[in-house]
Amino acid sequence: MFKTLYARIAIYSITVILFSALISFVLTNVYYHYNLKASNDAKIMKTLKEARQYEQSAKPTHIQQYFKHLGQMNYQIMTVDQKGHKTFYGEPFREDTLSQNAINNVLNNKDYHGIKDKPFALFVTGFFDNVTDNTVGINFKTKDGSIAVFMRPDIGETFSEFRTFLAVLLMLLLFISISLVIASTYSIIRPVKKLKLATERLIDGDFETPIKQTRKDEIGTLQYHFNKMRESLGQVDQMRQHFVQNVSHEIKTPLTHIHHLLSELQQTSDNTLRQQYINDIYTITTQLSGLTTELLLLSELDNHQHLLFDDKIQVDQLIKDIIRHEQFAADEKSLIILADLESINFLGNQRLLHQALSNLLINAIKYTDVGGAIDIALQHSHNNIIFTISNDGSPISPQAEARLFERFYKVSKHDNSNGLGLAITKSIIELHHGTIQFTQSNEYVTTFTITLPNNSL
């Protein structure tokens, strides 16, 4: 029954309607018992006493005819003479529940207030309880002696048309309410079902089909965010496919080259060629090892929850260590490295930050023309730490500039790098809550600028 949200909401709503009707009935019954019952008793008692006063003044020949006439005026009457004979006028009572003690009291000229003294019943409204003890009674003097007269209004006759009207009203109210609940529930569930189908399409790998945003409420917000999620998942899936393709290409090409070199190595007896092939194989395997290391680092950065960023880093000293480590490569190209470094402390992950800054210096050395210069600066700026590294070299096209930080992207197809260095650097800087930007001047001076929060304060 509750396997669908549609059934659950519909049944809950119908249950609320029925429960509300039941509670309303009980509260109305309580209100009648404590607020209306006494006044109703007094009103009927007044009517009965006026009837007795009229009977005594008019002295009708046949008092039975008088009571019969009252019965025809929508009253239910029971008379009891001194011998205990009971006579009923008007519509019959549902049940004769009046005690003999109450009858005797009325015969002894004591008024009976059965309506006011009716005990409270939770699911029975005293106003409609058609029994003889739910009456008022007084003593009538007749020529044959005293009789006890008990009377109550005939609710069934008085409100017969109204009861029919009320019954039709309640039936229509319930029918229309339940119909509207079912219809409104369907209108709520329909977009949820569409979301379910769209989710199933996502599971099957369909990231292209959007769902229409049909509402402006919470469901509409859910539809909007679902489409955003679909787009993000589509981008992630494309990145995954490109990543797999790029990794496959980066591994397949050197492996093919190694296979070719090994074949040549087996077929040649020239020691010079054999040594050259071995050196080439060593170079390629070194590149593969570097690719593996960078892929593992990328995976670590993508799943960074375990990484700690609580190392106290002397940034200027870290940069000096990197320059010293890469000085040999710079000297081979007769490059000058100029460093203007302020003494700055930073709280982060020293291993990762070393990798990020090393990547930038290695790139600068690689792409700077022979005999050129590399400028490095580190300084405070308000609440930030600014690191810049500039070098002169070949210009970079706007198309290439827009993709510099993409994984596996290479400015030149002849570049022997893996195309992961700048992507790794960007991820590391962002994990330190920083930013990295690339700019290029008209003189073909390229500059990378890293901005980090000054968290050492």
From Swiss-Prot:
Cellular localization per UniProt: Cell membrane
Catalytic activity entry: ATP + protein L-histidine = ADP + protein N-phospho-L-histidine
SUPFAM superfamilies xrefs: ATPase domain of HSP90 chaperone/DNA topoisomerase II/histidine kinase, HAMP domain-like, Homodimeric domain of signal transducing histidine kinase
Topology term for the membrane: Multi-pass membrane protein
Positions bearing Phosphohistidine: H249
Post-translational modification: Autophosphorylated.
Major enzyme class: transferase
GO terms for MF: ATP binding; phosphorelay sensor kinase activity
Keywords for the protein's UniProt record, in alphabetical order: ATP-binding, Cell membrane, Kinase, Membrane, Nucleotide-binding, Phosphoprotein, Transferase, Transmembrane, Transmembrane helix, Two-component regulatory system, Virulence
Transmembrane annotation, as ranges: 9-29, 164-184
PROSITE patterns: HAMP, HIS_KIN
Keyword Ribosomal protein: no
Histidine kinase domain residues: 246-456
EC number in record: 2.7.13.3
HAMP domain boundaries: 186-238
Highest taxon in the source lineage: Bacteria
GO cellular component, one term: plasma membrane
Database matches in Gene3D superfamilies: 1.10.287.130, 6.10.340.10, Histidine kinase-like ATPase, C-terminal domain
Stored Pfam families: HAMP, HATPase_c, HisKA
The protein's role, per its UniProt record: Member of the two-component regulatory system HssS/HssR involved in intracellular heme homeostasis and tempering of staphylococcal virulence. HssS functions as a heme sensor histidine kinase which is autophosphorylated at a histidine residue and transfers its phosphate group to an aspartate residue of HssR. HssR/HssS activates the expression of hrtAB, an efflux pump, in response to extracellular heme, hemin, hemoglobin or blood.
Protein name per Swiss-Prot or TrEMBL: Heme sensor protein HssS
